[in-house]
Amino acid sequence: MSDDIGKILENWDYRLGRVDARRVTGDDGSEKLQMRIDLGLLQMNAQFRPDGKRPFGHPTLLDHFLLRLEKHRNKHGGEDDEFSINPDECAKLQQEAIQFHHRSICNFELNDLEAVERDTDHILELLDFVQDYAAQEEIGSSFQQFRPQTIMMQTRAVGTQFISDENYGEAMEEIRAAID
């Protein structure tokens, strides 16, 4: 079997300015999401981490660090003083956030609004964690550039669901809360 994806790309045109996403079943039987990009496509798992990895045996890298924080607190009387994540760990968390962001874009295009909400919740929790525990404050601050986009995606997903349910007042409340 060839590793060339040319046939797939020939049958799925890239359209500038559009998000083209689809669901496929992987060779392993699991659901995958694909996003067409100009030079190819991105493929990600529909569940858990988009890249399918289990860092340190956990569903996500954030889960690993949250457990590390919990162990630190248990050892230090509930305090999180002296707990930090180094720049390399922050970079790996940033990579995880970007993967979840790509998947949330695909899921929004596919109208899987619950999945968008789940993934944006994960990203926002990750941003909070890095802001609170990055060893270098400027790294924690730099992560915050992703917050407005993530809040916007989450608000669009939740608001769209409210509108679909003809609950316009709740949709407006969601938008106002996001702005605040």
PLM regions with names:
Residues 104-107, 111, 152, 157-160:
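Conserved small-residue packing positions in alpha-helical repeats and bundles
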Residues 90-98, 143-153, 157:
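Start-of-helix signal in alpha-solenoid helical-repeat scaffolds, especially tetratricopeptide repeats
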Residues 1-130, 166-180:
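N-terminal alpha-helical interaction modules that lie
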Residues 159-163, 167:
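Internal amphipathic alpha-helices that form coiled-coils
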Residues 81-87, 132-149:
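Acidic, Ser/Thr-rich low-complexity linear motifs
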